[in-house]
Amino acid sequence: MQELGLKVMNEKLMYDVLSVPSYTGKERRMRAFIVNYALDKGYLCETDKMGNVYLTKGTLPEGGFYPCLTAHMDTVQLKQVPFIEEDKSLPLETEEMDGQHKIYTKGFGLGGDDKAGIAVALGIMEQMPVCKAVFFVEEEFGCYGSQKTDFTWFENVGYVIAYDAPEYNCASKSCCGVELFDESFYNSYLAELGPKLGLTKFYAHPYTDIMVIRDKTGLACMNFGAGYHNYHTPSEYCIAEEMDKAVSLGIYLINRLGFVRHSIPLEGNKELGATALLFSSNR
């Protein structure tokens, strides 16, 4: 493993997660990795009949609600299936690119969508004393795993942060027309991410598990870039420094949002205009 000098991201964890092969419907290796990792850390770990994984760390303050992180365990990279069946790890390559570090595989498709999101979520969880995380199967099949979850698990959750968007400087304002937050929440907590952390734009996302959570719970939901590029292609790669920034962003947001419940009614809310959600880091 090449040492990269990242600021907050656990580099071993990052490489370990990215080397685990996964494919839609064949998430067993990734599930086993997350479960073993969580048990080693002393987290409460549960799975359901779908194969989704639920983690809880720490004890809430009285009257508090958990921050929750989420990502999905499957990828679209079919060439990873032989590695799954033969219990082998993906051979990772690291090279410098424009002063940063690009992580990829030669010809197998990295599957950073959404293994990078898993690594970022677990990296944030390491840094937080109290946190929940859920990792879903079969997102690429139409969010099948998240649709089958038991949403009573979210009753003590205050808000949900997903990492299932490309690059670092992009985030979702909506998914398939489901608005993830309202203008008041954006102005109070998200607008500052541009000048403080370099998040440059929000956009309309086609679909991901966070829209299912938003629809079922009414909680404020967010979806941020996990540092992957060229997703769903054989040339997919991750930028380690962007994953590092994604961890920093999550830590910052959880400290800002606290252990309170941020509920935003779905009914009557309209999608925010794109122009209201575009801003630059030097604004």
Predicted regions located by residue number:
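Active-site metal-coordination/substrate-binding segment of hydrolases
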Residues: 63-130, 157
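Zn-dependent metallopeptidase/amidohydrolase metal-coordination segment
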Residues: 201-246
